[in-house]
């Protein structure tokens, strides 16, 4: 199933479901989210670093800059803009996370200023979604890395997690950072080569 089809299916559901779960090492309670496997193609992209505390406004400005550069270089755009987390939420503290805006393209792209050209690896990904915007990403990370991946005996393949923003509503009197958005997340995953502890299971079988 294509990534966009999976996202649309998630958007049509009540995305967050089930009783909250306590995840070891996480503060408070974390909800349960829909998640499933999808396959992404390897490709190239224009990328631009984002501030760690970026907003929707800053994200839009970065997307616009990448789109303008793609038009100047006559590069076909192959997907909607995305942003990526360069890090492992299960291992790296939030103050070490780095984000960048990503515009998938084809053709002979050239770097310009702080915009670079990168290879975006494909392969199997776990696709999930939160309808609660940027502020709920940490909760989604905790669910995926603390519960979903261990339950499937999977682990992060590489520390590069893609995200796509979907507008849910935008009223004329609302600011850009108050727009209701859903965030789709794509985690590159692989079967674990060593036993992965599952919350709630005893270490002794």
What does each of the following model-derived ranges do?
Residues 2-205:
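A solvent-exposed interaction/effector surface
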């Amino acid at each position: 199933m294509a990534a966009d089809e999976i996202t649309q299916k998630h958007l049509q559901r009540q995305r967050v479901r089930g009783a909250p779960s306590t995840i070891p090492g996480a503060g408070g309670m974390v909800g349960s989210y829909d998640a499933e496997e999808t396959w992404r193609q390897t490709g190239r992209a224009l990328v631009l670093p984002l501030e760690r505390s970026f907003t929707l406004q800053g994200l839009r400005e970065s997307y616009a800059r990448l789109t303008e550069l793609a038009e100047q270089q006559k590069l076909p755009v192959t997907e909607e803009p995305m942003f990526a987390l360069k890090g492992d939420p299960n291992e790296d503290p939030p103050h070490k996370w780095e984000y960048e805006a990503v515009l998938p393209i084809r053709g002979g792209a050239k770097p310009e200023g702080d915009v670079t050209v990168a290879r975006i690896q494909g392969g199997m990904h776990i696709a999930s979604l939160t309808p609660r915007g940027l502020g709920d990403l940490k909760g989604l990370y905790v669910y995926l890395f603390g519960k979903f991946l261990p339950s499937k005996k999977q682990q992060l393949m590489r520390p590069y997690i893609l995200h796509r923003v979907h507008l849910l509503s935008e009223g004329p009197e609302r600011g850009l950072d108050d727009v209701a958005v859903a965030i789709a997340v794509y985690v590159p995953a692989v079967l674990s080569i060593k036993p992965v502890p599952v919350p709630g299971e005893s270490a002794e079988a």
